[in-house]
């Protein structure tokens, strides 16, 4: 008997053997890989179906498997189940060496949003993000394909709602997804199409963006992200954009080159996400000026980055104002992460930033 397309998509999901095995080893499942609902994502649900991937940021995986980590904030502390998993899988050394935010500054790492909201309350959230991170370290190619399968599942749900999928892979880290490559066989591409109705491009050593390029071209799939990377080089903002991602540059106020990097990003046509310690309900500034003195300055209009997370829908060359969120366990070391909500010029390491109301 030949199944209809609808019946195939309702049938039990049969994943490729290596993907199914990887997920099982790390206590993961396909529906749980991506987050498709939280208060901010829901704000933009009418624009596109959002899906976001969360890993542990910076050196948080190393901290989570350190028995000597006595953090009073449980999600920032020692997670014995993660340590046991890393030991069992032979990943302890890799986990201790892992840095999920290679361009993160001290204040950014201290005040990371990984520990804001639900992520700051439940060790179970940190453990799930840790298991995903360990799976990435164990087999990057199989994990990349697992994320592709999970995202195709989200795309099918978006299509049922008459929406595009907006996929963000760096929810709480800065992994170089434009450099993560995997082999996608014609048979697997056909299986994805039969199951989810997607059109993916098979190939050897493809990125996720290359695999889903037909749907991006059709307007039904959007890859977007934030990054604190610099402008140039194989890991930089320009390389990420060229690889198929809609990028928003993240302003690092406590970086030695904060103003120069901000100027360069705006000049290259990127949006600039700027955290500001605004009280809830306070109006955002209308403009932002970044100056490096002799090297020049730029003034850009500002938009409210808390209205939705869909940065891809915002114009480029703007300041995206993000109200600072409380990160549980963050101390004074996190304060330089945000600009103060004042109209006077604020001195940074290599210039000034001025908010205008």
Residue ranges and their predicted role:
Residues 1-357:
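Class I S-adenosyl-L-methionine
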